[in-house]
C-alpha cells in the first residue's frame, strides 16, 4: 500500500473516493480458522522471518507464528476435483481466475529470492507443474503479485480480528482498550511483511503507479475499516471518516519506518507505532480535535511519500 496513494486519496478527488469506498455496511463473514488476535500479535513479536503456524488459542501467547502463511496444498498445487457417478475422480473445470490465484500464491515462496518479478511468478508456475510461460498471463511489473499478497494479508488479519471478537463474546478473552487494540492490529498486519521486507520498498513503488492506485487504495481503506469495526467503532458522523484516514496515515508512516529499521525484531518500529497511536488517542477526544489530528497526519504522510520515493529501489536496512 503506497503512502502516496493515501495522500492522493485524501485530496479533493481522492477524498471523495475514500468516502464512497468506506461506507459502513453489515458484515457477513465466513467460518474462520481458529486463532487469536492477541496471541498472534504477541507470537509475531517473537518470530523472525521463519514461517510457522499461528497459535490456536488465547493462552498460547508465546508460541511462534509464521510471517507468511504457506499456501494450502489443496488449492495451490492441484485444480479442483470431483467424483463422477461411476466413482472415478476427475478434474473439475478450473477458471482462468482460479489458475492465476494458484500461480500467484505459489509465486510468493520465490519472492525473497527473485523479488516481485515475472521470474518469481514463473518459478511459482513451475512448482505447480506448469510451464514457466504461464507467467505471460500477468504483467511484467509484478503489480498483480503484490496486490495478491496484500489481499491475502488483509484476509489473514480479518480472520485474526474475527477470532478475537468471538473469544470476547464467549467470555474467553477480555476486551482491550481501543488504543491497545489498534496498535496490536497494525503491528500484526505489518509483521506479515517481514519475510519480504528486503523487497518491500520496490513493492510500494509499484503500488504508487497510477494504474495500481485504485486497487491499492481500496485494499487500504478496507483494512483500516476492518480494524476500526472490530475495535468497536460505532460512529456515524464525520468522525467515521477522519478516524479511518488517521489510522491509514499511522499505518503508512509506520510502514516507512519499518523499511529503514535495523533494530532487533523491529523494536524501534513498534515504539514509533505505539507513540503515534497514543498521540492520536490523546488528541482525539472531540470531533474538532480528531479532524485536526487526521489533517496533521495526512500532511505528514505527504512528506513521507517523498521519503518513499527516495527509498525506491534501494535497500535502506542494514
Curated annotation (Swiss-Prot):
Signal peptide range = none
Bias (Acidic residues): 86-97
Impact reported for residue 301 to A: Significantly decreases membrane association
What does altering residue 291 to A do? Decreases membrane association
Q: Which GO terms describe its cellular component?
A: mitochondrial inner membrane; mitochondrion; ubiquinone biosynthesis complex
Q: Where is the composition biased (Polar residues)?
A: 52-66
- Which residues take part in binding a 1,2-diacylglycero-3-phosphoethanolamine? 244
What protein does this entry describe? Ubiquinone biosynthesis protein COQ9, mitochondrial
